[in-house]
């Protein structure tokens, strides 16, 4: 599963807009900033610091995040958001990444479904 480019935040100006909205939510592994927009669908930006490791490791983290977002796609609200990976995420398995990401997206009310888990 992949996320189309129309579902990604790419421009620095867009990242700055989302950060300046100051709607942030966090858990131990991820920080999420969100911005309400009039888009027909969500857009996501990913940020993985060089402090987390070399390029191969950072790209692995981004691949895992994109794959998890693709699985969550039917449950995501039409907002722009940026996911920032925190230290410790580099050792997580895909299932752990999904669990932690789902938790922080539910906190931010970006992920909505009928479940209460």
UniProtKB/Swiss-Prot annotation:
Its EC number is 3.1.26.5. GO terms for biological process: tRNA 5'-leader removal. It catalyses: Endonucleolytic cleavage of RNA, removing 5'-extranucleotides from tRNA precursor. GO terms for cellular component: ribonuclease P complex. InterPro entries: Ribosomal_Su5_D2-typ_SF, Ribsml_uS5_D2-typ_fold_subgr, RNase_P, RNase_P_CS. One of its GO terms (molecular function) is tRNA binding. Pfam families: Ribonuclease_P (PF00825). It is an enzyme of class 3 (hydrolase). Keywords: Endonuclease, Hydrolase, Nuclease, RNA-binding, tRNA processing. Belongs to the RnpA family. Consists of a catalytic RNA component (M1 or rnpB) and a protein subunit. RNaseP catalyzes the removal of the 5'-leader sequence from pre-tRNA to produce the mature 5'-terminus. It can also cleave other RNA substrates such as 4.5S RNA. The protein component plays an auxiliary but essential role in vivo by binding to the 5'-leader sequence and broadening the substrate specificity of the ribozyme. This is Ribonuclease P protein component. It comes from Lactococcus lactis subsp. lactis (strain IL1403) (Streptococcus lactis).
């Amino acid at each position: 599963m992949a996320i189309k480019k129309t579902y990604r935040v790419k421009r620095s100006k867009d990242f700055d807009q989302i950060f300046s909205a100051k709607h942030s939510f966090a858990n131990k592994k991820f920080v999420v900033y969100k911005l309400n927009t009039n888009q027909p669908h969500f857009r996501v930006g990913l940020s993985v610091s060089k402090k987390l490791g070399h390029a191969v490791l950072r790209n692995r983290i981004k691949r895992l995040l994109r794959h998890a977002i693709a699985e969550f796609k039917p449950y995501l609200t039409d907002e722009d958001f940026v996911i920032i990976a925190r230290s410790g995420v580099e050792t997580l398995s895909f299932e752990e990444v999904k669990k932690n990401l789902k938790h922080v997206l539910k906190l931010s009310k970006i992920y909505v479904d009928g479940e209460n888990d």
